[in-house]
Amino acid sequence: MVKIRPDEISSIIRKQIEDYSQEIKVVNVGTVLQVGDGIARIYGLDKVMAGELVEFEDNSIGIALNLESDNVGVVLMGDGLTIQEGSSVKATGKIAQIPVSDGYLGRVVNALAQPIDGKGQIPASEFRLIESSAPGIISRRSVYEPMQTGLIAIDSMIPIGRGQRELIIGDRQTGKTAVATDTILNQKGQNVICVYVAIGQKASSVAQVVNTFEERGALEYTIVVAEAANSPATLQYLAPYTGAALAEYFMYRKQHTLIIYDDLSKQAQAYRQMSLLLRRPPGREAYPGDVFYLHSRLLERAAKLSSQLGEGSMTALPIVETQAGDVSAYIPTNVISITDGQIFLSADLFNAGIRPAINVGISVSRVGSAAQIKAMKQVAGKLKLELAQFAELEAFAQFASDLDKATQNQLARGQRLRELLKQSQSSPLAVEEQVATIYTGVNGYLDVLEVDQVKKFLVQLREYLTTNKPQFAEIIRSTKVFTEQAEGILKEAIKEHTELFLLQEDK
């Protein structure tokens, strides 16, 4: 029989007592009263914050949005099919945040920054809040560097600068996404990080955009945040903020970023759905009262940072869809008042074969020529004026039968200028090519051609310049000025190419 030694037992007990520590963990817990339509009503959770993440028994997550006297309204980030009435909910003490890193470049993620492209996990050591405050007045400086879109109509007449917010607005099927994606394609080699946020779109449309980026080598500097039309309203509402948080990560590291929200009408609809289900009082068009704040707090995060903060920038191109060209609806007027200008795309122009279908008359950039290089300012000044006069004359010419020679010449010039603005999708032009194209048009070198020859002539002229006069592009790129030497080279090239072209056409 083993002899029990009291001193050994007492030392074991003493050790156990010394090692004992009493941990008190306070968890804020509530009970599900009701669940359905992506909304849960919770009893309890007394100390929950507005916007705090809460965790259900099935490990699904929700956001506490409505804090009422007797219950908490939570929006779910999933379908909520496994959440049962009476089950417990605990507050996490965290506000929605996402991991951020350089590893996100070239990836497709959802609104929670989780990869959905099947290429494995994304390594990240840093986190950013999805909703963070915008830079203040002292943290910013005025916009002065151009953000080239590669589209002649925009870069010459509605220029966009780094740190600007420019709205792209138009009816469905007018080429809004095409303008935005062309801008991303044009950032190749410009050292700009692009974020494309797809909200409530068909998954097939997003796949098409991602394929275009991949084929053109644009995916390596782009992050795609996608929430398809079948995603819960909560995730469609969060997606733009996730995109902004990813872009901010790069902006505060002294880099230039471009973010596209495609489109904010769908985000507003998702937010309206959530608000109505939470029984918040509806306002105009049944949107909640704070729908303006929904977009203003998002778009104010776009900025050009001051030199103390490293001069990084975040340029935002929000897209808004109109119904039958009605720009005076609630969401369009809200976003127009928040942004620094708008590019208006017209269905009539699109159907008339003018693509990109930009209505230059009512499109505007509130940054203006500050966002253009000197060479572009030198050649583009006359373009907008001549097009405006042409639009006026064209309306008048419909009623007048006999027009004098000067008016006929002006109409002919206007038709050729309008032809000059046409561009194929996914073929953005470098700024030196744009300068050459505009100069050719406004100085009457296209007047000798038929209208249907203009596009072909300009394509060939740009090729001719690249192969035979590479010094022209070099001067514009290095000096950013349309010098007398550059003008001389261009005039010579136009003269030589016109002779060749007319000989070809006569055969």
Curated annotation (Swiss-Prot):
GO biological process, one term: proton motive force-driven ATP synthesis
NCBIfam families: atpA, PRK13343.1
Source organism per UniProt: Physcomitrium patens
Domain of life: Eukaryota
EC number: 7.1.2.2
InterPro entries: ATP_synth_asu-like_sf, ATP_synth_asu_C, ATP_synth_asu_C_sf, ATP_synth_F1_a_nt-bd_dom, ATP_synth_F1_asu, ATPase_a/bsu_AS, ATPase_F1/V1/A1_a/bsu_N, ATPase_F1/V1/A1_a/bsu_N_sf
Protein's name in the database: ATP synthase subunit alpha, chloroplastic
Family, as annotated: Belongs to the ATPase alpha/beta chains family.
Keyword entries, A-Z: ATP synthesis, ATP-binding, CF(1), Chloroplast, Hydrogen ion transport, Ion transport, Membrane, Nucleotide-binding, Plastid, Thylakoid, Translocase, Transport
Major localisation: plastid
Function noted in UniProt: Produces ATP from ADP in the presence of a proton gradient across the membrane. The alpha chain is a regulatory subunit.
Membrane topology designation: Peripheral membrane protein
